[in-house]
Amino acid sequence: IGRRLTPYLSINSGVRLESVTVDNPRLDTSTELNNSLGTSNLYIGNVGIVRDTRDSVVQATTGSLFSMNYSQAFGDYSYSRGDLDLKTYRLLYQRPDGSGRHTVSFGTKLGFTGNSTPIFENYFAGGFSTLRGFDFRGASPLQGGVRVGGEFQWLNTVEYMFPLTASDNVKGVLFCDYGTVEEDIEITADNFRVAPGFGFRLSMPGAGIGAPLAFDFAFPVASAAGDDEKIFSFYLGVLR
């Protein structure tokens, strides 16, 4: 449920009811995974506030998007969770007709969750919308060879987007993703990841695809022991 307070500001709330079953683990070497085995019932209520001044939800060039959410879980697990998400966009240059825009953007995600959070609700990183250069959830804490995620995340990206064609249907990007997911609320140098890279954005409005296709190549220069790296990623959407 949401309500718009001003043209740029809105509030929202919701309830999530889930029954989650975890069984037959490939490895039984993780205490956190073993503690989550069986069927669990979760009842999660959340409230949030969003301020959105972007000029576009697909490929923004000016403005910002800020969201803050708080969740409280009940049922078989009881814990609190808080998330902050900020994205800002700055237009560097455009042609006189408004096309050919060069944009720099910055994004950061900060999240905390309680120590009673089950493994399937922990934070994980790795993949297009978190840390490129790593496999899906491949930049997350390990326990006994099992990806258990963590109670804290701080993920960031800096990106420069520029046109490669006069029609703006093909754009290039240079970026650097960096940050960490930790089992506890802390930042340790050994777990900090950094992955610069480049990519392309392909828009096909004639094919009825509103969101651009994203093709990215990232090369981790800092990673944690046990991380799964993956240079190429593909995505269709507007998460970045």
What is each PLM-predicted segment?
Residues I187-R240:
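C-terminal beta-signal and terminal closure region of outer-membrane beta-barrel proteins
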Residues R16-S19, R26-V170, L174-N191, S223-G226, ...:
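C-terminal outer-membrane beta-barrel translocator/porin domains of Gram-negative envelope proteins
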